[in-house]
Amino acid sequence: MSEPEPVERVVRRQRHTAGTPGPRRRSIVPIVLAVSGAAVLGWWALSGPAVDVAVGTEASQRVATPVASARRVPEWVTRTSAQRAATADAAPTLGNLPDTSCVLLRSNGRTVVEDQPGAAVIPASNLKLLTASAAIDLLGADTRFHTGVAAAAPPSDGVVAGDLFVIGGGDPVLSTDAYVPYEDHPRDLLTSVDVLADRIVASGVRTVTGSVVGDESRYDTVRDAPGWPSRYITDAQVSPLSALVIDDSRATPAAIEGPKDPPAAQPALHAAEVLTRLLRQRGVTVVGTPRVGAAPAGTTEVAGIDSPTVSQLAEQLTRFSDNTTSELLVKEIGKRASGAGTTEAGTAAVADWVRRSSLPTEVLDLADGSGLSPDNRVSCALLVALLERAGPDSALASWLARPGQPGTLQDRMAGDELRDRVRAKTGSLNNVRSLSGWFTPRSGQPVAFAMVINTTASGADRGEEVLSEQLLRSELGYPEVPGLGDLAPRAPRPA
């Protein structure tokens, strides 16, 4: 699913909070007085006369670099100089940011540029970085979600006596073959309901004397999350949430250029209707009408199908900002953590995972898993720490969108030098634009960054996106310092 059009705050709720945001402050990496002293000493050493050194009784060589020289602490001086230059380069962009924003760039564990890194901000879809990372750790990278089809007894002579239950396991990418072309981002990863229907037929089923019954009992039946306006679902930004969703619960494929069909009010009933239709197309007689209900204990599975792995789903939700996948993973996290397949249980488990992962929790307020809710709060410090925890060569880094390639950055930064230097997660809500990920300046030294802009004006637009790109362009030369070879001690020379 694509990033949503601008939205507005509609509802508030009690959220899972791990801290209280600190006051507003705009800061620049401080240059301590010792740096000035070192710089003066360094200048004196580089420009002043050499010092004679006696070796035994004969002064045969002159030391070109005195002991009290900046050349003898090149790493410290280089780091300080790089931070000062980076801050100066970023200053024009930082000066244009709204007060309710945060910025943090870090490289090799050191701050490059910062502006209110601990401020509480609405992250929009940058929250998916947390959801994807937590899902890998809490659910397992190789875990798959199973959709089963079961009956009270195995088919006898091709006849299922009674109902045929399709039991939802939380698979977010169940799709019919006919629906796939109408996805906003055609999926390389999906679970084919057509294949599931073929497997039912292959098991020998020819007649169902009852109904196809949709079972969504693994999760609750709350279709949305706190803070969502109804248009999120009606405009197809996210499916109605359920453990059993087929084709995003759309009644028919959406028109490519026209408005989306409204979603089915009952996702599990819609799923039962879809499977009934597919079975009848394959010559299976289904006597009853589709309905919703929980499968009784002791049923026998007739057929089933597994989803892609959690790792594959996490990659998809990160690169394409898939809201439905994010939300169903959170419900599954809640189910595994506490037995409750709810958004509330899932966000509580994710918040607990953040704390146990030793990530910054001073600002952590979760309302959903996708970032659609304006009730979410995180900090740039948390987002960058999460990226650094994984590293620039991690799976998380590889899932990020790239300019000019399929994903949410396909139409951004594709025509300039940033194209091959940025991997990032985008975010977009009304009054919010965010971008977090990895940036490689010309030096080749990876920089983790987060920039979250919350505006109080009529709404965020392309102008806010330009600011984030402008900031990265300003740091293409990082680190801007003399080379270590220029600062290293000179070789002794003859007296």
Task: State the predicted function of each range.
Residues 249-394:
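A small/polar active-site loop signature that marks catalytic segments
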Residues 82, 113-115, 334-495:
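Small-residue-rich helix-loop
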Residues 1-25:
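Terminal targeting segments of Actinobacterial cell-envelope proteins
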Residues 137-152, 288-291, 396-397:
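Short, well-structured active-site flanking segments
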Residues 100-102, 157-242, 249, 283-284, ...:
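Mid-domain, small-residue-enriched loop/turn segments at the edges of structured enzyme/sensor domains
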Residues 123-141, 212, 244, 274-279, ...:
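Active-site SXXK
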Residues 40-72, 144, 283:
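C-terminal region of N-terminal signal peptides and the immediate post-cleavage residues
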Residues 58-122, 146, 196-204:
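Beta-lactamase-like hydrolase cores
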